[in-house]
């Protein structure tokens, strides 16, 4: 285990993303002041060449076109622990039982629901929301310990999505 220093303040996206196994989705700029407050759910359709995969999801607020951002919240899930408790799960908050290991068959496509911790943030016009997906926590681990090719599906019957609670503006 090596010590890590985490810089305070606003980070630059280009510096953060150099040489990292990351899939990034960036929204168009917000057109008006927008508040996001509450629980966030990420539904993904995934497959892997291996029997399992880890998914780390982070949300960032992208402040400007120069890539300045800061992290809002995060969540993670080992896909073999995707089993949900139907009684405790809600539309906005999945609850995983962690009582059964559901390994993936090679290239089997399965849905997962990942809880991203609640947050509250106001976005100004021009700012963007960024979803970052990776196979490990890139903030703390240099190497990839989860090898193999993983796939995320985004269309048709396997449409993945991010469910975000937007608070209506006060009139």
Over which residues does each language-model region extend?
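Intrinsically disordered, low-complexity Ser/Thr/Gly-rich stretches
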Residues: 1-171
């Amino acid at each position: 285990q090596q010590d890590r220093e985490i810089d305070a303040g606003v980070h630059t996206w280009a510096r953060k993303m150099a040489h990292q196994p990351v899939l990034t989705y960036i929204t168009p700029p917000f057109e008006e002041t927008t508040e996001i407050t509450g629980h966030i759910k990420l539904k993904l359709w995934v497959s892997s060449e291996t029997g399992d995969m880890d998914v780390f999801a982070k949300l960032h607020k992208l402040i400007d076109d120069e890539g300045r951002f800061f992290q809002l919240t995060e969540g993670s899930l080992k896909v073999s622990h995707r089993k949900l408790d139907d009684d405790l799960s809600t539309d906005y908050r999945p609850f995983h039982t962690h009582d059964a290991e559901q390994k993936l068959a090679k290239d089997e496509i399965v849905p997962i629901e990942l809880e991203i911790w609640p947050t509250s943030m106001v976005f100004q016009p021009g700012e963007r929301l960024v979803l970052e997906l990776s196979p490990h926590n890139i903030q703390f681990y240099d190497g990839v310990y989860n090898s193999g090719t993983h796939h995320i599906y985004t269309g048709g019957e396997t449409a993945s999505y991010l469910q975000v609670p937007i608070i209506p503006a006060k009139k």
